[in-house]
Amino acid sequence: MPATEASPVVCSESAIVKMEDRKRPATHDHNDSAPPLKKQATSVNGGSKPHPDADMPWKDDLERFQKDAIWRQMQEYKREKMSLETKLKEMSKATAYHNDHLRVIDAWFNQLIDEVKTLMGALDEDKDRPSFRSSLLFENMEDFEKHLKARSDDIRAIITRLQSFSINAPPEVTDLQSQLAKKLAEEKGTIAELEKALAEKQQLEESLEAASLRYMVAEKKLDRARSLTVAKLEKQYLLGAQRPGGDSASGNREEQSPVNGLPSSAERNTELEEAHKQLVAVSEKQKEQLQKLESENANLLSQITELNIKRTKPTDDDYAHTDLFKQLRSQYDDVVKRINHLEATNIQLREEAAKLRSERTAYRNQVDEETQNVIAEKEAQLMRAETDLARIRNARDELLADQQMRKAAQEQEKIATTKVQELADAAQARINALESEVDRLRLQLDNTKAAHTEIDDVPLEELRAKYQNLERQYSMLNTELTSMQTACKKYSLLASQKVADFSALEEKVARLTAEKSKADQKYFAAMKSKEARELEVRTLRIQNSKSSDIVSQLKESEATTRSLLANMEKQASETKEALNSIISKHHAAQQQIAENNIVIDGLKAQVNELKALSVSKDSSLASASSACRKAETEIESLKVTLADTKKSLENWKNKSLGNSSSEYEMLRSLALCTVCRRNFKNTAIKTCGHVFCKECVEERLTSRSRKCPNCNRSFGNNDHMHITL
């Protein structure tokens, strides 16, 4: 009994109803079309029909249990009524909203069609138009076709007119348009179905939440209610307690034959004890199975935690067994080999670098010597330039002194020229005086010629005296003329000499001025060249320092470039060799990859097959394990029933030895079907729990009188099961 009461907690509502209906006895249950129990209890003549279980010891418990079951069923009906009322309110609200929505859409659609008709103008009936085939009508979908059938004519007419106004398109475009419209229509239908499914899912989720809440409340109430009646019933079934006076009644009932195929109280107690033992054995087995499953679950949880720990923090062994670790290990070995090779090459390169450093130092020393030689040469050139500069300065000083001397001589010559000029002026004055004297003498001579005309009148002695005077004057004049001639010659010579000297001096002055200008030009040119040489010397010194730095840098860069060139050549040769080896490895790897791809494809197919096989095996294993558990529980129950049947067999053997024919007939009548009275009971109806033979149940199923012969409760094709008494 505890198991039978606890089972509705985890079952559905229909299962609860079935279990509650099973608890009602066959004689007390009534048909759905029959009147209520109170009216059924009264007869026509006012007498009362005795209850078939009136003399049973569990009458009061049965009545209380029936009332409790009826009350629970009424509460269940009440809860269903409340849930259905809430659903009805929600559906009515949604229906009103959707009706308003559809009316608005219908009005909008009519307005749209009317506006399109007014825009398109009057309907031209005579004009032939191509038939319009669109996916907007949703002809292949029942819901859209059902809702849009009333609008299909308007839709077809208006869209046909729109199509007639459109530009003629090629058939490929029309086909693509029709396919696109069809796909869009399918998409809209799928979206509508999806929205409908989502709405249904939301409603079902809400109902599931409400049902789960009701289930939790009912479970609490059931746990609260189990503590009274169930404990009492368990106590009664375990202890076999009976009401006072029950022994005599039971003795009388044992002598009587069972009414309507119902067993006696002792047999019912034994059956209940057997059922209790079966349930206890089943519960024991289920406990063992649960303990086993819990242990397996604990092992699996521990394995899962271990695997999670290993997954979060794998050990070195786990890393060592992975393919990635093996691949990395092989790569690491290759890298170690390469590192060793590179270390050897590094040692060799270090030796070469030391050698190159020594060569570089030697070359640097050589370059330093060369630069020192060049610097010495440049310094010698600089000294020569300085000596030339000193010599030029000395020449300049000499030229300046000569210039000063020439200036002094020129001044002296200027004084001589002034004196010569004065002499020339004096000579000119003398010449002027002599000219005036000559003029005077000429006048005297003219006078004398005039006197010669009167010479005849002059005496001879006067003439002789005059002649003598004249001869003396003439001689004096001759002497004076000769002296004057000599003086004039001297004057002319001196004058010509002075003129020549002056002309020579002038030429010399002109030449000296030219030489002075040349000397000045040379001096300024020498000064300019000196400054230029000084600048050149400075620039040469700066360039020399820079060139020495540049030369050292160039030598260093040349050494580095040579070393880099050697290294690059070595690296190029190494890379060529490595490239060749890598190319060969690449070809081998490509071939191996191709082979591995083939193997991987095969392995993937095998893995997929094994996955499918593992899934099927898992499902079959789960079903087999569940079937095994069910079989184990059935085996335990069958073992208990076997033990009870063995005990009853021993009892019956003992009774058969005592020739107790009345008990045998009673048990035979209990085992026989209450309908045909010829076959044993082997089929139970699930809806009410009454037991009949298989032939009677199948006969009622084939004749469509699918109601229990005892309680008239209806049952279906799958509402019966085979039992073993």
From Swiss-Prot:
Disulfide bonds: none annotated. A zinc finger (RING-type) spans 673-712. GO terms for biological process: chromatin organization; protein ubiquitination. It comes from Aspergillus fumigatus (strain ATCC MYA-4609 / CBS 101355 / FGSC A1100 / Af293) (Neosartorya fumigata). Residues 18-32 have a biased composition (Basic and acidic residues). Residues 257-267 have a biased composition (Polar residues). InterPro entries: E3_ubiquit_lig_Bre1, Znf_RING, Znf_RING/FYVE/PHD, Znf_RING_CS. GO terms for molecular function: ubiquitin protein ligase activity; zinc ion binding. Keywords: Chromatin regulator, Coiled coil, Metal-binding, Nucleus, Transferase, Ubl conjugation pathway, Zinc, Zinc-finger. CDD domains: RING-HC_Bre1-like. Belongs to the BRE1 family. It catalyses: S-ubiquitinyl-[E2 ubiquitin-conjugating enzyme]-L-cysteine + [acceptor protein]-L-lysine = [E2 ubiquitin-conjugating enzyme]-L-cysteine + N(6)-ubiquitinyl-[acceptor protein]-L-lysine. This is E3 ubiquitin-protein ligase bre1. Residues 175-228, 269-526, 559-656 form a coiled coil. Residues 1-58, 241-268 are annotated as: Disordered.
